[in-house]
Amino acid sequence: MGRFTEIYRELLGVIFPPRCPVCDGLLSPYEHLIHSDCQKKLIEIKQPVCLRCGKTVIAERHEYCDDCRRTVEDCRKYRKKDFYRQGKALFGYKGSIKETMYRFKYANRREYAAFFAETAVDKYAEWIRQCDIDVIVPVPMHKRKRRERGYNQAECFGWQLSQKTGIPMARGLVRRVKNTEPLKQLGYVERKKNLDGAFQVLDSIVKYDHI
């Protein structure tokens, strides 16, 4: 670890004192990223899961969740290449994790990124290695939302993931040029329309095969 990184982490600890991502309470110097009692409250993703996005599916006979199944069928029907390889999930979106994600995204709890990144590496280290990833590119926010929120939680997570894996992170390779509606409020068709033309990819991204 370089001296600059050490100084950055020390400053980050002063500005954003470590808090438990579940209860949001301050962590003692002897606690690492999360209170031990709070760790038990998180519901980890278990099989069976969607082979494409990693979300829990109802039965093992279902390879894909409903959204991914429709996407795969559309790609086959219209002979479009699906550049998306695979996604992984850490926790089921229920219980304590809902409040955690809300604070991470909207309440300036960017320090939660360290917990999510370490959990991801612990759970999927072998999968990450097999993917042979060239660069981590965080999903960009529209400049208007970025100004309002003050930070991009995807960048916080990407930076922490980069630090823990050694995979470089690159900002600016993809720009968000359309201020889209929140996807959670939209159905499958509306989501596709909402994201149409939302991003601009820079030519410099072509030097990377696995992102």
Spans of model-derived segments:
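Glycine-rich phosphate/pyrophosphate-handling loop used in enzymes and phosphotransfer proteins
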Residues: 1-211
